[in-house]
Amino acid sequence: KVNYMKNVAVTLDAILGIDLDQSKYTFKENKAKINELPLEFDGFIQLVDAGQVYDLTFKTPTSSFKNFLGLIPAAYASSLDNVKTSGYSTVSGFAKGTLTDTRVPKFNIAIASNNASFQYPDLPKSVQNIVIDTKIINETGLMNDTYVNLDKLSFSIDQDVFNAKASIKN
C-alpha cells in the first residue's frame, strides 16, 4: 500500500469571491503549488447540507518535468535536488459535483508530457524521450467507478525502448 499524498507541500495564493449567505467560495486570481507543480484554478466550492459542491477546472500554466517528478510518492523516488531534467509536463482537469460520505464529484484529470528526460547524478544513463498521456476519470461520482487510462507511456534508456498502454478499473 502506497500513500500517494504523504508529506506533500500545498500552497495557495488566491483572491476568493466569498458569498457568506450561500457559503460559496469562488476562485478569482490564484496560484497554487503541489510540491513544486504549479496549478491555476477556476470555479467554486460551496458548502451545502449534503456536503460540498465542486465546480472547478484546473491546469498547469507551465511546468518543468522536474516539478512533475516531485509528485512521485517518496516510496518510489529519492531526493530530486541533483536530478537533471529537460522537457515539460501538463496537468489539467475538472471536478464537478457533490462530495458526500458516499459520493465524490465527477472528475477528469489529464497528465501529459512529451520528449522529457531525467538523469540521477549517480547513474550512468539518462531516461530520455519520455512521453506520457494519462487520464484519471470518474464519470459517476462513485469512487469505485474511478479508472485510469494510460494511453501512452514511452521512454528510452540508451538503446532500450519501453512502451506501455493500460486501462485500470476496479
Question: Predicted regions span which residues?
Answer:
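Hydrophobic lipid-interacting interfaces of membrane-associated proteins
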Residues: 1-50, 59-67, 85-100, 109-169
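Extracellular loop and loop/strand-boundary signature of outer-membrane beta-barrel proteins
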Residues: 2, 78-81
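Extracytoplasmic loops and strand-loop junctions of Gram-negative outer membrane beta-barrel proteins
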Residues: 24, 74-79
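Short, flexible, mixed-charge acidic loops at enzyme active sites
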Residues: 68-73
